[in-house]
């Protein structure tokens, strides 16, 4: 029997075995097969990574911006060359189907492409005549050592939101990837090194709470980016801010899709099925609530059930599979408890994902689950379940639909299905969410726009990606000169 390998940390350009003596297994969620072991590193190992990043910053900050951009361009090329390998790795450790994983790799590559445009993005501003013989200008500079804490559900895309842009801006980076999906992070570091990134500019420390708290409290880390659940995001924001750090913490969601009576139901059903059950519902832009407006509700629910019945469940590497497993057995059990709560609180269980054949075999499978006649305030409406569970709420009109969506504590995304320009305008103006979709499945923006949730979906001032990302990873100097 082949011995399961234990992953290493990446510190100062070297792969370093952890000395903590603690580790966890990394199973394939579709089969339970152990892929690797991941170290649960110590605070001392984090300190070593920060020290390496701090030392590397002394020279990296001086590297001309066009030269940094060329390294990013080479990195982008390597990611494209290894696209299929990276997608397969995402499926193996995360469980999402290969098609979803392939798309995730594309989004990660797009983030690197955006970061490679750093010469334009880093430009400052200048006014030559603020007074007679006096000019003034604003210049951007890197912060220093910055850190990222990333989740299991997008092991390629979310790290690529963070470290390529931060490094392009002249910072050095310490990444703490999810201990559930650590394999992809290490591969990203290998390819960045191959692209010519100097030692110490990117460091990876695997771990859990001790490493997270070390990042939040470390005096030499100037900024922290986080993506994860709402309670942890709030903790990260409050703790890091208390230590004087710049923070962006992207949190949970409960995204509503409003279906109007004039909607194209074929398109709406296809999009909702993709948004609700794609990636097993484990994404912060998943559609978890449908608000059916008027007399369209019965037909919509019937069509959603029929479409869900046709979904093939299984290993994400198998041909034709649409729905893979959730990330862990504990998450499967948590999802089943939410289904039980929904029944107990009086929602109508239209499709029970617990009964799908795949749920009784190996792997952590839950089939597509649909509730109808869900009321705002029910637990399955309120909580982020983060699984293939869809709630249908009924509303009399658009006013009530928007009021229902706006009652959620979260404000990541929302969609509307309609051809009415009036309804679209009202939705755009009145809905309380950061990323809006009109007749689209998932309104997640591309890398050159900010990922802009708010309320309890976001803690901080500057969002990930786009100009917000550049602002987050740089500081400004104003220079006023007399000639």
From Swiss-Prot:
InterPro entries: Ald_DH/histidinol_DH (IPR016161), Ald_DH_C (IPR016163), Ald_DH_CS_CYS (IPR016160), Ald_DH_N (IPR016162), Aldehyde_DH_dom (IPR015590), MeMal-semiAld_DH (IPR010061), MSDH_GmP_bac (IPR023510). The keyword Iron does not apply. NAD(+) binds at residues 152, 176, 179-180, 229, 384. The active site is at 284 (nucleophile). One of its GO terms (biological process) is inositol catabolic process. Keywords: NAD, Oxidoreductase. Pathway: Polyol metabolism; myo-inositol degradation into acetyl-CoA; acetyl-CoA from myo-inositol: step 7/7. Transmembrane segments: none annotated. PANTHER family: MALONATE-SEMIALDEHYDE DEHYDROGENASE. Belongs to the aldehyde dehydrogenase family. IolA subfamily. This is Malonate-semialdehyde dehydrogenase 2. It comes from Geobacillus thermodenitrificans (strain NG80-2). The gene is iolA2.
